[in-house]
């Protein structure tokens, strides 16, 4: 549903003193993002002297929800019930969603940019595939249940160009392709649990030995070295390796619940949650006793995506 249209700098087709800047921010795999992107590009191509090149910002699902919350805090009542997967701006002033941009382009600039829904869907599929390929990163998933009730999937982008060894360890532990360790430990996250929830800190899992939180094993042996500390803990959803001190990474991992700069230079972060906003919220909300979940939070399946 289109949101109420907001006032924007231009109300006629007469050339403005300065070219207008259209910005589109949205969920990269939503058709509404493609609709807005197409409208913004049509405005530029039809009126090149009236418009700057459009700023097109595709974001992942988790990042979109974070962005939307920030905008709701910034703009307050103006977008409190905003439900679209895209936001369109003219000279940094909110216009509305994709339909609002189409209507504005038609009313003010006589641009008709309406394509069949099937075409937008096809454009979305092609754009999404290219968007993920262009990252040159690997993607993995964890399916989660709480007390046998499936709550959904966490999807992570692994920064394999920055931390290749750490990412390979996590990726193969997700797929289970390494089989068993020399000590007989099954090197697979499936069946393991989230054993710790630190309020406003992180959720922790990956003890594939006994699930107590005091053990784990990597695909390289019991532990491996800290690869680097290039990735900062500067937001919610950062994925990192738990350790017992320098160079003691195994299989345990954490997902931050907010920015945690105190973890920088001490723990190796190597990825980011990109989908699973509600799932992470469920995990951080489970009742605990001494930071251990009272409910059984299990990884029921894990593997690689988009390979």
From Swiss-Prot:
Probable inactive PPIase with no peptidyl-prolyl cis-trans isomerase activity. It comes from Bos taurus. This is Probable inactive peptidyl-prolyl cis-trans isomerase-like 6. PANTHER family: PEPTIDYL-PROLYL CIS-TRANS ISOMERASE, PEPTIDYL-PROLYL CIS-TRANS ISOMERASE D-RELATED. GO terms for molecular function: peptidyl-prolyl cis-trans isomerase activity. GO terms for cellular component: cytoplasm. Residues 141-304 form the PPIase cyclophilin-type domain. Belongs to the cyclophilin-type PPIase family.
């Amino acid at each position: 549903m289109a949101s109420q249209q907001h006032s924007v700098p231009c109300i006629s087709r007469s050339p403005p003193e300065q070219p207008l800047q259209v910005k589109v921010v949205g969920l990269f795999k939503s058709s509404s993002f493609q609709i807005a992107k197409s409208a913004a590009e049509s405005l530029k191509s039809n009126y090149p002297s009236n418009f700057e090149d459009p700023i097109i910002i595709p974001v992942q699902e988790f990042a979109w929800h974070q962005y939307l919350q920030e905008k709701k805090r910034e703009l307050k009542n103006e977008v409190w019930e905003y439900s679209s997967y895209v936001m369109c701006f003219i000279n940094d002033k909110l216009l509305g969603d994709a339909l609002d941009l189409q209507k504005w382009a038609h009313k003010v600039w006589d641009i008709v940019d309406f394509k069949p829904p099937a075409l937008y869907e096809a454009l979305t599929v092609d754009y999404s595939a290219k968007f993920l390929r262009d990252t040159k990163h690997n993607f993995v998933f964890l399916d989660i249940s709480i007390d046998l009730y499936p709550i959904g999937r966490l999807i992570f982008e692994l920064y394999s160009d920055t931390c290749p060894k750490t990412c390979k360890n996590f990726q193969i532990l997700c797929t289970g392709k390494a089989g068993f360790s020399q000590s007989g430990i099954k090197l697979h996250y499936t069946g393991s649990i989230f054993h710790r929830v630190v309020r406003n800190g992180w959720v922790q899992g990956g003890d594939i030995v006994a699930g107590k939180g005091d053990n784990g094993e990597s695909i390289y042996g019991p532990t491996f070295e800290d690869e680097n500390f290039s990735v900062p803990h500067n937001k919610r959803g950062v994925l990192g390796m738990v350790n017992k001190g320098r160079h003691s990474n195994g299989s345990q991992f954490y997902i931050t619940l907010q920015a945690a700069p105190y973890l920088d230079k001490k723990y190796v972060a190597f990825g980011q949650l990109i989908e699973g906003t509600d799932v992470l919220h469920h995990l951080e909300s489970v009742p605990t006793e001494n930071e251990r979940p009272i409910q059984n939070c299990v990884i029921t399946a894990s593997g690689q995506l988009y390979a």
